[in-house]
């Protein structure tokens, strides 16, 4: 009965920590792979190609000082919070799934917004093929960050700030379109941009978390 209350890592006293980025794709792709990776640290080092990280760095550098309504007209006026306001890694307090099992959420958010008239937003930049419902592919990741900022915890060095309410979440998509010009060493590439908003759904989130912990608790 006690195993239903507090899951520890196999052969360890560490609390179960789930990263927002692993809540959507990995458990669906291969449950056994996810089990082995989380419980026994066995698995491939499947990092995305470095070029996508470069896209992200360039996009964030361009938008970091702009009003958030410049990202998309679907967002109200506000500003992107800077590194001095947010720790490099944010974590939740101890949470419980639908079966009372404890876990912590922890990760590094892409874009966190403070709106001028109150409330906060969590936006992720993705270089991808544009689709209207793209945010559905990342719904648990985005809600995980909403949970973290609504129920913040602390790392050994820094406390995660309370940001409440989270009023907007979504994916800002960048899709390479065409090259405008070039010279010997560079080219000017144009990208189409589209915003895919997401409504919060805590019920669905905790149902998914419960399924994930069921996988890990087999």
Predicted features, each with a name:
Residues 1-119:
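Metal-dependent nuclease catalytic cores that hydrolyze phosphodiester bonds in DNA/RNA
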Residues 3-20, 152-218:
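Metal-dependent nuclease catalytic regions and adjoining charged, substrate-binding loops involved
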Residues 40, 127-130, 150-154, 217:
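Hydrophobic/aromatic-lined pockets within catalytic cores
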Residues 46, 126-134:
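Short helix/strand-bridging catalytic loops that position acidic/His residues to coordinate divalent metals
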Residues 57, 135-140:
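Short, conserved loop/turn and helix-capping segments at secondary-structure boundaries
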Residues 104-106, 137, 164:
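A generic fold-level signal
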Residues 108-110, 119-129, 141:
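Active-site ExK catalytic segment of metal-dependent nucleases
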Residues 139-151:
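An active-site-proximal "capping" alpha-helix that borders the catalytic cofactor pocket
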